[in-house]
A protein has these predicted regions:
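Long hydrophobic alpha-helical segments that form multi-pass transmembrane helix bundles
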Residues: 1-3
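Outer-membrane beta-barrel pore domains
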Residues: 6-158
């Protein structure tokens, strides 16, 4: 849905099934040939190619087998940026929660600062710095409460 210029509202819902696979060292997720999986995502974007860029999304995924959650995850982000000539600097907050595997790095809040530079139409360079913060269960499992990430990328369209 596009109620006004540059603004989009989107959503998706997936209902389906997946199969468990035998993995080296044990069984896969679930309990049989067909395990239910539901997923939805909703989001809103405002992207003026000569100015403000705002985005937000929320997603949820769940699979329950024999009254037990085998997948129960939430994710969200909010992004703000400004198109400034060939540059697009941004700041972003995102989070992910895994309610089944609570002691893993899948449970975080992150603040990201980045910038994309459009070299020309089909080539962009991007640099991002992310600071991850982990909840109590993840801290216990990981042995640390935060981590850093530096990402440098080239994006090419052919």
């Amino acid at each position: 849905v596009r109620p006004v210029k540059y603004f989009n509202i989107k959503g998706t819902f997936n209902w389906g099934e997946y199969t468990s696979k035998k993995l080296e060292g044990g069984e896969g997720v679930g309990s049989g040939d067909y395990n239910p999986m539901n997923r939805y995502v909703v989001g809103a974007w405002y992207d003026n190619p000569r100015g403000l860029n705002l985005r937000a999304e929320y997603g949820h995924m769940k699979s329950r087998v024999n009254k037990t959650d085998v997948v129960k995850e939430n994710g969200a982000y909010v992004l703000a940026g400004w198109h400034w000539g060939k540059f697009l600097p941004i700041v972003r907050w995102d989070m992910y929660e895994d309610h089944v595997n609570t002691g893993t790095a899948n449970n975080y809040n992150r603040i990201l600062i980045g910038c994309t530079y459009s070299v020309f139409k089909n080539m962009k360079l991007q640099v991002n710095y992310g600071h991850f913060m982990y909840g109590d269960d993840a801290r216990k499992g990981l042995g640390y409460d935060s981590s850093e990430q530096l990402q440098i990328m080239g994006l090419f369209k052919f």
